[in-house]
Swiss-Prot record:
Organism annotation: Clostridium botulinum (strain Kyoto / Type A2)
A Pfam family this chain is assigned to: OSCP
GO cellular component: plasma membrane; proton-transporting ATP synthase complex
The protein's name in its UniProt record: ATP synthase subunit delta
InterPro entries per record: ATP_synth_OSCP/delta_N_sf (IPR026015), ATPase_OSCP/d_CS (IPR020781), ATPase_OSCP/dsu (IPR000711)
Assigned keywords, A-Z: ATP synthesis, Cell membrane, CF(1), Hydrogen ion transport, Ion transport, Membrane, Transport
Annotated compartments: Cell membrane
Protein family per UniProt: Belongs to the ATPase delta chain family.
Family matches, as Gene3D superfamilies: N-terminal domain of the delta subunit of the F1F0-ATP synthase
Function recorded in the entry: F(1)F(0) ATP synthase produces ATP from ADP in the presence of a proton or sodium gradient. F-type ATPases consist of two structural domains, F(1) containing the extramembraneous catalytic core and F(0) containing the membrane proton channel, linked together by a central stalk and a peripheral stalk. During catalysis, ATP synthesis in the catalytic domain of F(1) is coupled via a rotary mechanism of the central stalk subunits to proton translocation. This protein is part of the stalk that links CF(0) to CF(1). It either transmits conformational changes from CF(0) to CF(1) or is implicated in proton conduction.
Amino acid sequence: MYEYLDRRYALALYEVAEENNKVDEYLRDLKEVVNIIKNSEDICKILKHPEINTSRKKEIFTELFKDKVDNKILSFLLVLIEKDRILYLEEKLKEMEKIYLEKNNMILANIKTVIPLLKEEREELIEKLGNKYNKKIILEEEIDKSIIGGVYVRVGDDVLDGTLSTRLKDIKKMMLKRE
C-alpha cells in the first residue's frame, strides 16, 4: 500500500546522494541505521511510544547519529520521524537499493540450493541470467535444506523452480488426480 510512498522517499534521497557523489556511502549508512533500529529494543520503544513527542524523538536521533551519518541522511531520518514513517525505513532502503540496481543496469537474482554452488556453476548461472535479462547479475545465494535438491531462482517477478521438493509435490498432485 505504501510502496509508492517508499519509492518517492527513496528516489528523493537517491537523487541527493547522486548530486553529492555519495550513493554508496548513503546506502551503507542507511543499512547501518536500519540494523541499529532493528536490533535495539530501546530505540523501537522510543519510536513507538505515544507519550514521547516528535521533537524529543528527533533530538534522540540527532544525538545518536549526528557524527555517524552524513547530515543529509540525518535530515532524511528527521523528516521520516516528523511524518511518522521512521519505522518503515527498511522499506525505503530496499527501494533505494532497487533504484541503484536499475540505474546501474543490474538485477538481483535470489538463488536457493541445498549446498553452495561451485564456482563454475555460479559463473555459468550468472552468464545465462545475464544473457536472458541483458543486465549485470547480482547473486544472492541462500542454503535451504527444505528444497531437497535442485535450484530455485527468482529474478524480479520471474521464478525458475527446478527443486526436487516442487517436483515431488507435482507428482503427488498428479497421482491424487488419477484416483
